[in-house]
Amino acid sequence: INPISWTNDDLPQLGGDTPLETCLVEGTEIGYVGFELGNKFPKDPAELKAKLAGYGAVVVSGWHSGNLAEGTLEDEIKAVDAHMKKLVFNGCKVMVYGEVAGSVQGQQQVPLSRRPRFTTMAQWEDYAKKLDAFGAYLKSNGITLAYHHHMGAYCESTQDLDTLMKLTTDNVGLLFDT
């Protein structure tokens, strides 16, 4: 389960005062044993493992705010290193990738119509190539990339998502976000 059920990382005014312990107690009481990471979880891999073990829980995924739409593959690999190692240390097999480059997510004064967009197939192909290579890198480290399309980002609409998935291989999975 994702801690967004209790506390929202994007809009801290929604549950920002809810302690992590409340999420863990209530989540495990209703039968969940796996949690996606949020901002309230310990950053240190060993502290994270110990915290979750205290509730009989494990890490099942961790969000990564990616910038491949406007950055390089090499920079993204450097940026993800500590997070990926934390997931691997904790036995986690899935990383949720959300593209945040140029995103208007969280900017409530900016209309969603001003979100970034790829306007040519060449831009889509370049992005898909980098994302696919990033997914291959994660896979070589035992992690599956689960792509999270998102409101206010480059990949938002059904058409965007269809285009992206057609241009990538099984190195890029799709997150079912309910």
Label each region the model flagged.
Residues 1-4, 35-37, 59-64, 95-97, ...:
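Hydrophobic faces of well-ordered beta-strands that scaffold small-molecule active sites
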Residues 1-19:
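Boundary/entry segment of secreted carbohydrate-active catalytic domains
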Residues 24-28, 55, 169:
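Catalytic alpha-helical scaffold of carbohydrate-active enzymes acting on polysaccharides/glycoconjugates
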Residues 7-10, 67-71, 106:
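A short acidic, helix-capping loop that chelates divalent metal ions and anchors anionic groups
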Residues 43-63, 82:
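Aromatic-lined substrate-binding rim segments of carbohydrate-active enzymes
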Residues 73-176:
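Active-site acidic/histidine proton-transfer and metal-coordination neighborhood
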Residues 34-47, 66-78, 151-157, 178:
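Acidic-and-aromatic substrate-binding clefts and catalytic sites of carbohydrate-active enzymes
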Residues 18-42, 89-95:
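Catalytic domains of carbohydrate-active enzymes, especially glycoside hydrolases
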